[in-house]
């Protein structure tokens, strides 16, 4: 052996024996080396396999959104026809049979990919499968997480944390405590030395408080540790420590006396506590735990303390505060002393004000907040109080003692100021400390335990006082306190409070401002209720801006004068920016009040005596402010946000009982998940202190957000803090509380007088209703009002500003010389009307960079925040679509990647737009829409935001934009886009006419006064009229121009208009919302609607009135949100009986526009109100009739309207004075626009090229019907082929046809009915969209825009014809029919119905597609259907005449697979067993589906099994709509024809909230 230490002593053996043993050792070494080599090789293989698996997972993430359900995620080949693949048990990747297989794991069979199988074999072979590598154990274990970000080693772990790591029984032993003494004793000299150096530095350098601040911060943890240890020791130990400290550091005699006196006080206090609380000595474990927790919190103070105090106040403040803290310590220690002892001890304590040793055993309800401000600057003084002149002189002496080290002139002013307030201070503090604290001690001796832990139980002797006290306590804390914003963080939350100086004397209350002025108010005789107390405290001057009397007192930010606005708040650092002279005394008063409100529980009580009314009131106020509970209203005034710290009593610390039961994972009214309080134990801490109620939502628990947290996450968060001595809560409660407990006075009558109404009242309430992460304590001081706006306004008000100022100065062709585009001058009206009624869900972070040299705009999509989860709580698959409006073509479209299963997506993608000049850029608006990808259904719309590029920084600065759900079209940015598009439409239209016309007349300019009819509103109308008037292409078309050009190429015109407006109709989020208020006939002014309704479908009363008219607004409908469809209002509107007239009117006007009618947008004569005159000679009788049709908002004019066909004459017709008619005129002037139905996200945009390949089949079909009434035997007209050569239509012939069609439709047209019955089949065969057309596949339309042409619809015929079915197939996705044909189908999409009128002998409920006309029947199958309690019973009986695969002599073994479909989603599936090998098999097998037949479709597929050749050969398919059948307990038997899969009827997206579709009114 090479290593002699491994060899045993072989000297006593012979050489042969020694050789044998050495050979054994050698073989052992070889085996070990071989094993090591094998292990290393296995480890390398494992790491390589892990690397490959990781790469595969990353690759699979990129497949999201590409139909990955059918792709093997390992070989990335399409393997799963049914979308069902096996996932690996280990890596969760879907794999095919080549890339994976079944494996045995313990007692069950699993599916594992090949890599994972190999990995498991290696693990099992090397033994690592059951002997995993040892992980290093953390040195500190426990349920509480470490608050420090540093590694927890023995070197840097603070002593309290090291002590916490010890077992509790060890901490209870005296040896453990004694072992900890020397370390604390060693710290004492340094502590005293630091204090003396700190005093000298303050005397010498008054301009560098930060050095002192930092030095004291460094010493605070040691000092507090020392106090913790000293509290466990006797008087001798304390005196010994102090003697050592005095020996190491020379001190003055005054300081030495003070230290000795302090030790005596501590000994007396400890003896008193031990006598009163016997159980407390036996429960040191929980106390140690709390002390260590307190020390842990103290360790966070250097990072959490602001430096404003140090920057704004001199060193005299530090001495003053240290002195006050020392006095507070005396007050806590000296509970049973006489007045003389108190005076003497306090006098001795003057010199020792730098020895800050508050006992942590006796702190605190506000542990965190006390320690946050525990340095020299941020001490909270509690002045010693008494009722004698000695106390007052003593107080003055203390103040003088603390002030002699600073500027004498400043101290002289402060002393004069204090002389006016000393008596009130002493009486107030006497009342607060003596009356109630002594009463607590006398009535309930067990309360001392609660007090030591920071929990004050309510007095048991006065229930009414207890109730009033707590309610007023919350009121005062929310209205009188000056609260800092609560910064929620993982390491601990800090709250800095500055309570206004409220002091009472005799019956008076003084409010002191920074200059020392005071206003006195007398206490009324009847002060019985909390509202009386509030009136007494705050006075009746609710809206005083300069007086210090009001609903609250707060400091101004720099002026030094307090303002008294209701519920006013100010930051504590702003209080210190006033004048130094008044600031010192004001700071003293405020810190005194904070020490009273946040002071440690005081066990001291003074001698009894008579208490005046003012003292009683002051004591009540101080008691109410003693608990760390605050309530503030939210920004929208609808929620109360409570912040509190609940401390467990010793009895409840063991089992972690706070008296609360919280259940997480419940749905809130905003759709998010939340945690709610379900039970509150009476008499518990949560009941008596927190005043929590069942139904309150817990927003945060110990700094962890519970919003959007599942049940398990909430459970884990609460369980993690089970052994914490204190729990910090942020809860949310509805402001309108049952029982009238509106303790923040948020009723509507008082909201107007509060300061909150000043900020949000003028702003739209919908933007404050659902804030993603609302600042729980908004600072709305007048000087800081700009900071107090909810952050959602940032996504809105920049857009407002651009509408009023910025864009108007640009060199825009359309906006030049145009004032204030459509924005009313009244700001309040503007802000309340300019925005939609959408919810706010989440935010999105973007940045923009514009390169002037390259003319390139870069849009960086960074990340999203707080997206709403799905209804079942699962996360989303978000992606973003970007359009640079008003262009909505493919050229403008950008789309991000899909981030799987997250509510906080990170995209980090950059998109580029080239060729943008700066004037163009300033006119553009960027639209970001957020979608949820769903691979099984329709993608859900999550929200959108509009970004005006003229108002955002273009230098790469990141901006957070709020995502609005259902942003309405009355947003000013949408209006700008609409008007921009309108200009493009008009100009393109006029330019086309200019090219087609032979002669023009000179333009006639009208005076500007003619355009100012709508003085109340509409700059929109004026703006449109002005711009139309100013365009150089607006010439008057002479009457004889009609003769000059016989044809107008309507296809080119419409295509140009379509391209100009963005390449296609914009599919939108709802159906036809614009008629909710005005019935769809026309539009009133957009400012008429002042009341908005909340919710996703705010369909009642939309004030948006675009100039484009009804036809254009169909292009501007809203997107569907997921699968939601029409609201009730919209459904009723779809069945509006006036709709037929509107459609007729639109069609007639459309025909006139596209075939060269005389009226158009040129300089036609205007009425005095700016509307265009259209003579009757330019109108068809049908149009004239429709102008006078009744309409829902014009009942007063119904008697004036004409019926029937009017004779044709050339005089101006009487226009009704409806507010809608200007837009109705506009509507008639518009080119044809589509009436869009329901669209999925895939149909968001149309291809630019899709408009060029549309056939004008509608023109031919319409002309067929037009000629029907004139010549019933004119077969040549009906036999026209709908090809592209019909694009040009003679104008004269069209006019005649239009007249004939109108009269025939109005009169009933029996001849047309007969022709329709005869020609039905041939017409429908010719009416197949897309014939002879070429275009790229856009993959969206399916069958939604395929419907019955207008003249064939049953509502236009007196005898209804059977409704037709909109069909879908592969061809139906071609863009050849999707765009132009959709625009020409001005009627809505019809309901799905049977198409069996030309396909005979279909089974009951069977639906087929139009491809069955050219598809052979592949056989028949007999099916029996039943519906019972168990669901749907499908019996597959038998089949016949099945077609065998060509070229195969062997018959297959047929079997049937049945899919239960809801829309495009497969709900369930089942299959039969294979029958015998024949073409007429007999099955007789039942398949049961546990679902309702409502909205369901059965898809029956017959497959053939050819054995080893092919096991799944398609033999035919049939589709059955169960909703068309009346299923019952009796079986419904029928023979169903089998066709190819291309014959399936399109189902379209499921409309879950609409039982009847658009065409349901006809049935």
From Swiss-Prot:
Amino acid composition bias (Polar residues), ranges on this chain: 172-182, 356-367, 379-389, 1086-1097, 1242-1255, 1278-1288
Main location: other
Compositionally biased intervals (Basic and acidic residues): 25-35, 326-345, 1129-1154
Domain RabBD span(s) in chain numbering: 7-133
GO process annotations (BP): defecation; intracellular protein transport; locomotion; locomotory behavior; mating behavior; positive regulation of multicellular organism growth; positive regulation of synaptic transmission; positive regulation of synaptic transmission, cholinergic
GO molecular function: small GTPase binding; structural constituent of presynaptic active zone; zinc ion binding
Tissue expression as described in the entry: Restricted to discrete puncta in synapse-rich regions of the nervous system including the nerve ring, the ventral nerve cord and the dorsal nerve cord. Localized expression was found in the head.
Keywords: Exocytosis, Metal-binding, Repeat, Synapse, Zinc, Zinc-finger
GO cellular component: axon; presynaptic active zone; presynaptic active zone cytoplasmic component; presynaptic membrane; synapse
Role description: Regulates the efficiency of a post-docking step of the release pathway. Acts after vesicle docking likely via regulating priming. May regulate the conformational changes in syntaxin. Binding of vesicles via rab-3[GTP] to Rim may signal the presence of a docked synaptic vesicle. Rim may then signal to unc-13 to change the conformation of syntaxin from the closed to the open state. Syntaxin could then engage synaptobrevin on the docked vesicle to form SNARE complexes and to prime the vesicle for release. Not required for the development or the structural organization of synapses.
Protein name per UniProt: Rab-3-interacting molecule unc-10
